[in-house]
């Protein structure tokens, strides 16, 4: 998202970035927060094209000529419909393509930005972990094996106060 913001700024555009997640918006939300996106659309909160345009107008009124919109593939309209142009063999919505759909719909009604769409798709799963990620994974794995060796189950390994520990699953939920 950071790189797309730089591209949006340097070319005076609005970048629409479609991310995976199906019916859960946490990937889009966390990507948007980490990348400082201007708009984030998730399945849990229905959207309107008018609402998106209103936000883009606010951005423009503040003197900015660029914006970043992060959209989860499973977003829903106000009436609860998944935005999808395709259906599978049993009539369920096939996810993907919502970024281009939004680009087309917004462009028809608001011309103050040029829009470009990027679909991250499986690239989201292929980032290179930093050293801390690798260390944390190793520590979590070691703790999980330790718990199993001790005959403990129904626990989740966590990082708390700078240490690896475990909590009972019912306490997590």
Question: Where do the PLM segments sit?
Answer:
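Accessory alpha-helical/coil subdomains and C-terminal extensions
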Residues: 1-114
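C-terminal non-catalytic interaction/assembly regions of soluble proteins
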Residues: 94-173
């Amino acid at each position: 998202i950071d790189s797309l913001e730089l591209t949006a700024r340097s070319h005076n555009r609005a970048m629409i970035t479609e991310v995976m997640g199906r019916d859960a918006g946490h990937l889009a939300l966390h990507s948007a927060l980490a990348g400082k996106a201007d708009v984030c659309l998730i399945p849990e909160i229905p959207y309107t094209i008018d609402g998106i345009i209103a936000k883009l107008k606010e951005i423009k009124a503040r003197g900015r000529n660029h914006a970043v919109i992060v959209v989860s593939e499973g977003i829903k309209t106000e009436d609860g419909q998944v935005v999808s142009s395709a259906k599978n063999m049993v009539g369920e919505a096939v996810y993907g393509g919502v970024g281009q759909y939004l680009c087309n719909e917004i462009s028809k009604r608001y011309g103050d930005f040029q829009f470009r769409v990027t679909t991250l798709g499986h690239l989201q799963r292929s980032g290179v972990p930093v050293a801390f990620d690798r260390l944390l994974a190793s520590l979590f794995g070691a703790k999980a094996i330790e718990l199993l060796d001790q005959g403990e189950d129904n626990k989740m390994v966590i990082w708390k106060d700078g240490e690896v520990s475990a909590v009972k699953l019912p306490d997590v939920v």
